[in-house]
Regions:
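Single conserved hydrophobic/aromatic residue that forms the stacking wall/gate
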Residues: 1-8, 13
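Conserved glycine-rich Rossmann-like NAD(P)H-binding loop of the short-chain dehydrogenase/reductase
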Residues: 23-39
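Short, conserved SAM-binding/catalytic segment
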Residues: 43-52
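Conserved Rossmann-fold cofactor-binding substructure of NAD(P)-dependent oxidoreductases
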Residues: 57-76, 80-86
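ADP-ribose/adenylate-binding Rossmann-like module
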Residues: 83, 92-112
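Hydrophobic beta-strand scaffold residues
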Residues: 101-102, 130, 398
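Rossmann-fold NAD(P)-binding glycine/threonine-rich loop
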Residues: 106-128
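C-terminal catalytic/substrate-binding lobe primarily of soluble NAD(P)-dependent oxidoreductases
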Residues: 125, 150-401
Length: 401
């Protein structure tokens, strides 16, 4: 059985997609779960006649007995709860202790690190496989690097020691859950200087190999990128994406080398217009970071931001998309570029399909007799299997430019 938890916009989109993709009462046995029976019934009703027989499970995040019973009845738990630092630990603990596979949309690196440290031993003993960051952060980045490096090995005989990701274009609404998680992370960092230093460490998700420390070179402001021939600005999601990519590198035995470099950026175009756009976007990001760091302005900003669970209209989701490139270069100057695209709003439509396919991959793509339990990344656990699923069923493409 596959079981999904928590009511919200991402959950509604994901469940609508699953209902269309696998139905109810077929090969895939699944249910929706959360703490409010009335909201779950409302969600089920919104799915129409075809979802009328979808099972409902009521469980609260602070009820360990109910959570344990819930996860024992499932092969996979997929959760959209957030911010995860506030609501997510009890479900991770239940899955790790009971051998139930788990995936989520978490982009809170400091919380993921805490879960890795606290529950890796339990997961390894039970066989539970736990995979965070199964949405727009960080599947396109993590699987994009995996796809590019595999082609580099085939074409050049070695992996790239340097990769950069460029967001060429994207259209979609801001995710209330993602923004809430960012703000919660800022609040936690402000109150704990030690945590703030940890969050600035690009290797925060590699606690098993604490001696990693080769400096990464994230861009901090507008730059002209010679390889792409455009101006660019920082990409806000690099804060989690790069850390997931580096964890994948570590879990794989560091095949790209001890000095592997990875960065992400948002392309803004050529000429004066591109330069002005790069400066403008960089300034907006700096002002947003400053406003959420200062308590009075943070409270003001939060009044105007979408709340967790709120999302764009179905029409806006369909009109959304993303288009990114990843460029690798080796020491001989040889280069290869790939492209990763999605056909829906990245934060909702595409993310919902990514999470659903990650859940199905956990349920059906692995040998149950070989339970390699622990905390994984999308690339290191699902890799090519998930790429194929996303290309075949989720409107994504992975291609060589």
């Amino acid at each position: 059985a596959i079981l999904f938890r928590l009511v919200g916009s991402e959950m509604c989109i994901r469940d609508s997609y699953l209902l269309e993709h696998v139905g109810v009462g077929g090969q895939v046995s699944w249910a929706i779960a959360g703490r409010s029976e009335s909201k779950l019934e409302g969600l089920r009703a919104s799915l129409g006649e075809s979802g009328r027989h979808l099972p409902i499970i009521v469980a609260n995040a602070d009820d360990d007995t109910a959570l344990a019973g819930m996860v024992k009845s499932a092969r996979v738990i997929s959760t959209t709860v957030g911010p995860y630092a506030l609501y997510g630990e009890s479900l991770v603990r239940a899955c790790a202790e009971n051998g139930t596979d788990y995936c989520d949309l978490c982009g809170e690196a400091y919380w993921i690190k805490r879960m890795i440290i606290k529950y890796t031993e339990a997961a390894e003993q039970s066989g539970a496989r736990l995979v965070s960051c199964c949405g727009f952060d960080s599947i396109p980045s993590d699987l994009g690097v995996h796809f590019l490096q595999k082609r580099a090995k085939e074409q050049f005989g070695s992996y790239f020691p340097k990769i950069k990701l460029a967001v060429n274009a994207m259209k979609g609404g801001a995710s209330g859950g993602t923004l809430a998680s960012m703000i919660e992370a800022v609040k936690a960092a402000k109150s704990d200087p030690k945590l703030r230093r940890e969050m600035n460490n690009p290797y925060i998700l590699c606690p098993e190999k604490a001696d990693l420390g080769h400096p990464q070179k994230s861009i901090r402001g507008p730059i002209f990128d010679q390889d792409f021939g455009q101006w660019s600005a920082p990409f806000i999601m690099e804060a989690i994406n790069a850390r997931v990519v580096l964890r994948s590198h570590m879990l794989s035995g560091m095949p790209y080398g001890d000095d592997f470099l990875y960065r992400e950026q948002m392309m803004t175009g050529k000429g004066l217009k591109g330069r002005l756009s790069a400066f403008g976007l960089s300034t907006v990001l700096d002002l947003f970071a400053l406003s959420v760091f200062i308590t009075p302005t943070r409270k003001l900003v939060q009044r105007f931001l979408p709340k967790p669970g709120e999302g764009p209209s179905p029409e806006a989701q369909i009109a959304g998309y993303f288009d990114i490139s990843l460029l690798g270069q080796n020491s001989n100057g040889q280069k290869l570029q790939i492209r990763v695209t999605g056909d829906r709003d990245p934060g909702y439509g595409c993310t919902a399909k990514m999470l659903a396919q990650a859940s199905l991959s956990l349920a059906f793509d692995f040998d149950e007799d070989n339970r390699n339990g622990g905390f994984w990344t999308p690339a290191t656990l699902m890799g090519d299997k998930l790429i194929a699923r996303l290309a075949d069923h989720a409107g994504m493409t992975f291609s060589i430019n």
